[in-house]
From Swiss-Prot:
SUPFAM superfamilies found in the cross-reference section: Phosphoenolpyruvate/pyruvate domain
Enzyme Commission identifier(s): 2.1.2.11
Protein name according to UniProt: 3-methyl-2-oxobutanoate hydroxymethyltransferase
Enzyme class per UniProt: transferase
A cellular component term, taken from the record's GO annotations: cytoplasm
Cofactor note: Binds 1 Mg(2+) ion per subunit.
GO biological process, one term: pantothenate biosynthetic process
One Pfam family here: Pantoate_transf
Organism whose genome encodes this protein: Thermotoga sp. (strain RQ2)
Cofactor(s) of this protein: Mg(2+)
Family: Belongs to the PanB family.
Amino acid sequence: MNVEKLKKMKGKEKIVMVTAYDAPSARIARDAGIDVILVGDSLGNNVLGYENTIPVTMEEMLIHVAAVKRGAPDAFIVADMPFLSYQTSVEKAVENAGKFLKVGANAVKIEGGEEFGELVQKLVESGIPVMGHIGLTPQFVNRFGGYRVQGKTEKNREYLLRSARELEKRGAFAIVLELVVEEVAKEITESVSIPTIGIGSGRFCDGQVLVWHDLLGLNPDFAPRFSKKYANLYEVILKALQEFRREVKEGLFPTEEHSFTDKSKGGVSS
């Protein structure tokens, strides 16, 4: 997969993107035939225990992007630019985005609308592919006053449309639409020539993205309406750990089968 192939999928084949934060997850995503792996700054609240994405640092993101690359070296990987890694200056943004490509990302994702058009253009001119992200942008949640659906007012609808067109004009190869009302997401999708990838933005985007922990049911305390739980791995893992604990406590594990003697043959693997 590459930028040009993704762009050609618009209107022909739905794009599938998932988040992944480590090598084993990336390998599974690759083996499942996922088109794009996003190393999201959602790392913060899904893996690092932060309340939201705002505390996530460049250093943390770089570690996880590199891990994902090792797990799926041939995958198309997009790295989220974390809070304040690109907002302070164009020069700083180019420097930070370049770091992601050096550790294995194929592109970066930037939250924000038309006000970041010049920055997107500079990144693209520097050889860094950019995926835009408009609608609900979690890094700006304090400005929105919470996690609210976007596109409900005419003013906001017009802003989102302008932003999508500006990002396209400046060279973005795709745009994530997050929590945008379905009608507006459809209008945006039809108004630009680059793919839109929706999350909580209805049926008419060119692709869909979900967070790893949401679609696999790894967080029992969070069930967003826009997501779908395709598995309940929290319960699967919980039961496995409970069974392990029980067998150790009762002396049922390890058995002779799991032990070595001076007559054992072969190596560690079975």
